[in-house]
Swiss-Prot record:
InterPro entries with a match to the protein in the record: Ribosomal_bS6, Ribosomal_bS6_sf, Ribosomal_S6_plastid/chlpt, Transl_elong_EF1B/ribsomal_bS6
Claim: RNA-binding is one of the keywords in the record: yes
Listed GO CC annotations: cytoplasm; ribonucleoprotein complex; ribosome
Domain of life of the native organism: Bacteria
NCBIfam families: S6
GO MF annotation, one: small ribosomal subunit rRNA binding
Keywords for this protein: Ribonucleoprotein, Ribosomal protein, RNA-binding, rRNA-binding
Protein name: Small ribosomal subunit protein bS6
Source organism of this protein record: Pelotomaculum thermopropionicum (strain DSM 13744 / JCM 10971 / SI)
Gene Ontology annotations of biological process type: translation
Amino acid sequence: MRKYEVIFILRPDLEEEKNAEVIEKFKNLIESHGGEIIKIDKWGKRRLAYEVKDFREGFYIVIQINAEPKLAAELDRVFKITDEVLRHMIVRENE
């Protein structure tokens, strides 16, 4: 297993319950594919460096996980088709 840092930005117009729903969706996806969640950080609403999909702010989430490379690819695929996610990035951390 490799260590990854998953960062994603949710739309700022979502309600708190919807944010929690989306986070839970990705948490369940990670665990169902054999990944291990180390830590979840909610940075809250922050200003974006530039406009993304007509939004100037976003709700930042950072998740540290241990996972196989196949899971990272699956997460990337699901992030791309999830409307609530403005941007995402998956980075492999050095051991």
